[in-house]
Amino acid sequence: MDLFQTFQTHNPVIGVVHLLPLPTSARWGGNLTAVIERAEQEATALAAGGVDGIIVENFFDAPFPKQRVDPAVVSAMTLIVDRLQNLVVAPVGINVLRNDAHSALAIASCVGAKFIRVNVLTGVMATDQGLIEGNAHELLRYRRELSSDVAILADVLVKHARPLGTPNLTTAVTDTIERGLADGIILSGWATGSPPNLEDLELATNAAKGTPVFIGSGADEDNIGQLIQAANGVIVASSLKRHGNINEAIDPIRVSAFIEAMAEGLKSKPSKSTVVDAPAGTKSVVC
């Protein structure tokens, strides 16, 4: 994945738009217009603060289905993402929770979004939805069938989950890239708002061998300068909201402060840590 081609920077900050509850979810309020307006406000605030990309998630649809979401969710997210792309110039991505990568890829391919996030691409994770199995085989075939160039960013040992058996981070990273054909990997802490530790990021980056590594949770103005030393980019949500509260709206002032803190951290980052990888879908397979 060529980060500069997608984001116009080798070290992108991707801000998250957490959608209000969508149709058929447990907390759906019956007003899609309100959901759209909130999403537009969030995207505008992120763009005003200077993010390099935006990812849209059905975050407030919890509790999530284990696999496929309802068609109404897909329809709503398609409508919203399309509108956001006409509102901001930053590239937009999609994450359909908990692990509906097929729907995310379909939406992205149809509206021209640039990337998707997949919580479990390979392996098996024990989650609050039950056991979730990665299905890279079907997803990569589906991308080929769609003639799509949407990049796949895959979590490794995803948050709010535990792997079956004894986890090995370097093996999981290698398998996700070489056997799951992920275009980039994401490393998170144990839960939303919890950062990965620096040692794990360094291990992941070394194992990735040039494939982009993103910080997937817990980054804030205080720690991003250190965390970015061992990663290529960051996906950030909680710390950009008013008072750092996940339930509040995006605060463009906090976004700007985060961007500035990361820029300061990048000044001390060795240039060799900047990587540019192959285009989506061109990795070799290890059997």
Curated annotation (Swiss-Prot):
Coiled-coil positions: none
Pfam families noted in UniProt: BtpA (PF03437)
Domain of life, per lineage: Bacteria
InterPro entries the UniProt entry points to: BtpA, RibuloseP-bd_barrel
Function noted in UniProt: Regulates a post-transcriptional process during the life cycle of the PSI protein complex such as (1) translation of the psaAB mRNA, (2) assembly of the PsaA/PsaB polypeptides and their associated cofactors into a functional complex, or (3) degradation of the protein complex.
Family statement: Belongs to the BtpA family.
PANTHER family in alphabetical order: SGC REGION PROTEIN SGCQ-RELATED, ZGC:162297
The protein, known as: Photosystem I biogenesis protein BtpA
Originating species: Synechocystis sp. (strain ATCC 27184 / PCC 6803 / Kazusa)
